[in-house]
From Swiss-Prot:
InterPro entries: FAD/NAD-bd_sf, MQO. NCBIfam families: mal_quin_oxido, PRK05257.1-1, PRK05257.1-4, PRK05257.2-1, PRK05257.2-5, PRK05257.3-1, PRK05257.3-2, PRK13339.1. The keyword Flavoprotein applies. GO terms for molecular function: 2-hydroxyglutarate dehydrogenase activity; L-malate dehydrogenase (quinone) activity. It holds the Pfam family Mqo. This is Probable malate:quinone oxidoreductase. Pathway: Carbohydrate metabolism; tricarboxylic acid cycle; oxaloacetate from (S)-malate (quinone route): step 1/1. It comes from Neisseria meningitidis serogroup C / serotype 2a (strain ATCC 700532 / DSM 15464 / FAM18). It catalyses: (S)-malate + a quinone = a quinol + oxaloacetate. Its cofactor is FAD.
Length: 488
């Protein structure tokens, strides 16, 4: 007998937690069930050590504003990402202020920096600063080529550096480090207190649609072969990170045809030595290598995890065919179907430089990887750093009318035409934009409910519907409010 519920959220990460809280705030009477394949929430991509913890607000990430063919830098994409992060930040602040999260320990003030180290990159960074400084959301950004000034911002990165090497940096004091694992756990704890049912160690075996439009999920208990659970729901969200593609394919919705995925794994060096970690207080992003994917931009970060400060450097791209860190090596081959084979072949052929780059990364020894760290931290001691494996990211491959198939970086909502099912595919900027992504998903799937939600949404997100960059006075009010509540 199927257990009926209004909403099923598949995946125990930041996306399901965010959508769950939004729905509980907007539709308190709806019954919600969250199912997770592992024994707890936030053990895959949302776990603190499976992502970089950057509150992506485009202050330091150079790939969000590349140099155009005309020599001009357009800040539009960077502004869009910054606006989205501020929506998330407002939502988190409201939940803290209303006592719905335990505290604000999941977010810490950590300055964001960009550091570049050759003449061309220094010229680019100057142009980027010139394009950004006139924008409200970037007005506090600083730029310098003065080595002493840069040393004040990031002493470890300048100590022992060649005096003749050109360097330039920008600095934004309002950057953040976010423990998305802790945030997810706090959100789910709140949901459980509101009656949301959580089912752990549940693997989705099958997804079918019944004649009345309801979705039926057959799940198995990963610890007990006889522990079957069947759920029946009118709305299904597939937010299982890299596993969402496989679930989307199981659903059989026409909107999911032609989608494929390319998994990329990440490695980081981590330093937990207190005396070293205390000397660096910034997330410092550089320029990606030629041919490198956007998620491979090198950065030396301050991380605050479970009340302790660490340093982390990376990522180093790798390849494993599983879609989740605790997934199966058969994930990629089993995801290839007749409807996505051609798009995947076309995307693969068009991205040979990426394939070459990944092969080169895979062949690197630990010493060769450490040499990259020395470019950013010249006096780094190899004995103080351990190499850790972060989470899997599945990049989207989709059909394209002109190219056959394209590899797409970013996130994408794929929803059934009637709004009864939605999946979130892709990666960066991911968790930082969870709130605007889930609000957009809700409007797409429940258009008839949206008007009745406006009032509460404006309480949850005080600047809802407003572009902060275009409303300076309101931006000052909201940014000051969220900074005070979140202690950032």
């Amino acid at each position: 007998m199927a257990e009926a519920t209004d909403v099923v959220l598949v995946g125990g990460g930041i996306m399901s937690a965010t959508l769950g809280v939004l729905l509980k705030e907007l539709e308190p009477s709806w019954e919600i069930t969250l199912i997770e394949r592992l024994e707890d929430v936030a053990l895959e991509s949302s776990n603190a050590w499976n992502n970089a913890g950057t509150g992506h607000s485009a202050l330091c990430e150079l790939n969000y504003a590349p140099l155009g063919a005309n020599g001009i830098i357009d800040p539009a994409r960077a502004l869009n990402i910054a606006e989205q992060f501020h929506v998330s930040r407002q939502f988190w602040a409201t939940l803290v202020a209303e006592g719905k999260l335990e505290d604000n320990s999941f977010i810490n003030a950590v300055p964001h920096m960009s550091l570049v180290m050759n003449e061309d990159h220094c010229s680019y960074l100057q142009k980027r600063y010139d394009a950004f400084k006139t924008q409200k959301l970037f007005e506090n950004m600083e730029f310098s080529t003065d080595r002493n000034k840069i040393s004040d911002w990031a002493p470890l990165m300048m100590r022992g550096r060649d005096e003749n090497q050109p360097v330039a940096a920008n600095y934004s004091a309002e950057g953040t480090d976010v423990d998305f694992g802790r945030l997810t756990r706090q959100m789910v704890k709140y949901l459980q207190g509101k009656g949301v049912k959580t089912e752990f160690n549940r693997h989705v075996e099958d997804i079918k649609r019944e004649s009345d439009g309801a979705w039926v999920l057959k799940t198995a208990d990963t610890r007990n072969p006889d522990g079957q659970l069947t759920l029946r729901t009118r709305f299904l969200f597939l937010g299982a990170g890299g596993g969402a593609l496989t679930l989307l394919q199981k659903s059989g919705i026409p909107e999911g045809k032609g989608y494929g995925g390319f998994p990329v794994s990440g490695l980081f060096f981590r330093n937990s030595t207190p005396e070293t970690a205390e000397q660096h207080n910034a997330k410092v992003y550089g320029q990606a290598s030629v041919g490198a994917p956007p998620m491979s931009v090198p950065h030396l970060d301050t991380r605050n995890v479970d009340g302790k400060r660490h340093l982390m450097f990376g990522p180093y791209a790798g390849f494993r065919s599983n879609f989740l860190k605790q997934g199966s090596l058969m994930d990629l081959p089993l995801s290839i179907h007749m409807d996505n084979l051609y798009p995947m072949l076309c995307a693969g052929w068009a991205n040979m430089p990426l394939t070459k780059y990944l092969l080169g990364e895979l062949r690197k020894t630990k010493e060769e990887r450490f040499a990259s760290l020395l470019e950013y931290y010249p006096e780094a001691n190899p004995d103080d750093w351990e190499l850790i494996t972060a989470g899997q990211r599945v990049q989207i491959i989709k059909k394209d009318s002109e190219k056959g198939g394209v590899l797409q970086f970013g996130t994408e909502i794929v929803a059934h035409a009637d709004g009864s099912l939605a999946a979130l595919l892709g990666a960066s900027p991911g968790a930082s934009t969870a709130v605007p992504l889930m609000i957009r998903l809700m409007h797409q799937c429940f258009p008839e409910r949206a008007p009745s939600w406006e009032g509460r949404l404006k309480e949850l997100v005080p600047g809802y519907g407003i572009k902060l960059n275009e409303n300076p006075e309101r931006a000052d009010e909201i940014i000051a409010y969220t900074a005070k509540v979140l202690d950032i």
